[in-house]
Amino acid sequence: MSARIFRVALLLVAIPLLFGGWLAALALPASAQNGVWSAPMSLGEYWFPDVAVDASGRAHVVWSSGTTGFDSVMYAARTPDGEWSRPIDVFAEPQIASGSEATRPTLFVDGENQLHSTHRSTSIFYSQAPAGGAWVASYWRPQLEIGEGYFSRVARSADGVLHLIYTQNLQTETCRICYHVYYVRSFDDGESWSDPQDISLELTGSAKPQLLIDTDQNLHVVWESGMGGSYGQLSDPTTVIYVASYDGGESWSLPYKFDPARGTSTSAMARNITIGEDGNGNLIVAWWAIPEDTIYYQTSRDAGRTWSIAQPVPNVLGIWALYQSRLDDYTMATDSAGRVHLVLAGRRTAEQTWPELLRITWDGSSWSPPDVIAAYQGDMPEWPRIAVGLGNVLHVVWFVRDAENLFNSAAGNYRVWYSTRTVNSESIVPVEVPLIPPPQPRTVVNEQSAPLPTPTPRIETVPVEDPVAPGELVLSQNIRSENDEVIVLLMALAPALVILLATVTLFLLRRRSRHA
């Protein structure tokens, strides 16, 4: 009998331990070790996210959302351990005439762990915040209006100069709505900005510009070109264009079309261009060829002065056959080994009838096979953005359109998603970026006011009507005594004691009947 009791006791101890371990495993943050993408995590509603990583490995995410009467910029941060801050709206722009505008926020983190951000309503705004305090809305600098516009990007060069590009409509007789790409810079940490310079110089519109500052501090800008540019899209046909500045933004090269044959008819178009730099200092661009649904890439070994002939990225196709989007885009980032990671919505085979969010890696000479970050049936992933933290941790954000409302954003159930993965490049030692606590309210003291004299209390006898004798005093039911906790404890243990007593009684009865 003693052996049986021991086994029962061991089981009673083991079950809680196993159950507790299972719950602890469920509570752990999603892991991205050993080359596995973490399970996509929803950050909230609505669309067009961006991501940047500071020197501690903390990932910062912004996205466009809104509520009744306001269009907002949402912000959340993830620690290297996988803990997320509570999403907050760091900016809220009043809606005009009840019309909603996508705020389209962007992020850039500089070497001093300062976050630089742009967003829009009908104008472009710039702001910044310390990476350790961005989770507190009041730590964001009051926004500064740059000018009317739609798309924007900001970056900081090694000399501390801020560089900002944005699109703004330039009306001409031949094009009433043609958004050009403008460039401004700031030498005083964003307090003031230069006069805008039109760097597109095309008689057409522009959309989705991207800005890269290479290791030699040259500026590179790519964008999608066509008629229009308002509300984030162009009319067909479209092509992709590049310009560069080799003197810190003082002057710019003439626009260069990556494929001159594209953009003249709907039978040959290009969209969704992105640009990166590999570990050898060579530039690489990737763009989407329509309608053949091919992803092309081109490289430059002389800082963009000349480019290779376009070649297809192997083993990956676009999603034109599934969803003819004008608002999507591609994204690139480079890890500590110098490999360029391209993220896009695509397919791996022509027969594939569902979209996937894919990552393909350029090692300086060839592309890796695509790996799947997320796959969908009916829903459509869109607008991915990637950042690399600590040299080898990939952070990817995107949003998803629900199948029922692909082209109806007002009724859509669109959500922003996040996934991460660690790759086999060298890890960079993190630098501490401590969280800045929220400011404490201050007590304002008027030093000019003389202190008031402390009054001397007067004790007076007060007549009491119908006094109650001490023995007749009735205690309120809300007054507690020292014995209350004991009573509560006994009440809590009563069911367990009853069960234990019943078990012992049953055991004794069965033992007595066995010996009878």
Labelled PLM ranges:
Residues 30-506:
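Extracellular, repeat-based ectodomains that mediate carbohydrate processing or recognition
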Residues 8-9, 20, 374, 483:
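Generic detector of short alpha-helix boundary/capping microenvironments
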Residues 512-516:
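Cytoplasmic C-terminal tails of single-pass
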Residues 1-5:
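N-terminal secretory signal peptides that target proteins for export/translocation
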Residues 7-11, 490-491:
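Alpha-helical transmembrane segments of integral membrane proteins
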Residues 9-25:
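Bacterial N-terminal signal peptides
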